[in-house]
């Protein structure tokens, strides 16, 4: 991919619990991240689709008001029900082709590719709009298990060879994100670093690192 003037952007991932005051926290994070936060992933586990949709609706409205893409994790069916901007697929969540058939041409479809060049190329060939590599660091959100840890060289290779954007994920903080930005990550997917403390301050700290790159 040729050098681009578009800087690295933030891709916020929700905590598993989005009840209570989370909509207000999301609002504050997006206000602090204008021009930097461009996508939000709705990621909940262990609840039925009806409850997930109920929890998603106010968050989706907040994202729309801030011109931030609302992406559903794992579930093509929920993304279709919500008319979400996109869906993020793990390796066991269906194919980009299936998602495209269900969600239409305009949907943003992302695929988890761990540390695999092969999976990323397959995803691109299948019509993915972005590929996600990780976990780069220890993370409560992305359990690496025995998975191979991706390298900075993987990001560099992808960004130089392919036009499809790449997302770096897994344990990313303002303190460790600079090498990922320099290696060519188009997006930093972040969760714990934002929601475990002051979301405004965290987003602003990421924005400062991006601006300094």
Swiss-Prot record:
The pathway to which it is assigned is: Cofactor biosynthesis; thiamine diphosphate biosynthesis; thiamine phosphate from 4-amino-2-methyl-5-diphosphomethylpyrimidine and 4-methyl-5-(2-phosphoethyl)-thiazole: step 1/1
Gene Ontology biological process terms in this record: thiamine biosynthetic process; thiamine diphosphate biosynthetic process
Q: Where 2-[(2R,5Z)-2-carboxy-4-methylthiazol-5(2H)-ylidene]ethyl phosphate is bound, by residue?
A: 139-141, 171
**CC cofactor note:** Binds 1 Mg(2+) ion per subunit.
What cofactor does this one take?
Answer: Mg(2+)
Binding residues annotated for Mg(2+), in chain numbering = 74, 93
Q: Which reaction does it catalyse?
A: 2-[(2R,5Z)-2-carboxy-4-methylthiazol-5(2H)-ylidene]ethyl phosphate + 4-amino-2-methyl-5-(diphosphooxymethyl)pyrimidine + 2 H(+) = thiamine phosphate + CO2 + diphosphate; 2-(2-carboxy-4-methylthiazol-5-yl)ethyl phosphate + 4-amino-2-methyl-5-(diphosphooxymethyl)pyrimidine + 2 H(+) = thiamine phosphate + CO2 + diphosphate; 4-methyl-5-(2-phosphooxyethyl)-thiazole + 4-amino-2-methyl-5-(diphosphooxymethyl)pyrimidine + H(+) = thiamine phosphate + diphosphate
- Which EC number(s) does the record attach to this protein? 2.5.1.3
Q: State the protein's purpose.
A: Condenses 4-methyl-5-(beta-hydroxyethyl)thiazole monophosphate (THZ-P) and 2-methyl-4-amino-5-hydroxymethyl pyrimidine pyrophosphate (HMP-PP) to form thiamine monophosphate (TMP).
What protein is this chain from? Thiamine-phosphate synthase
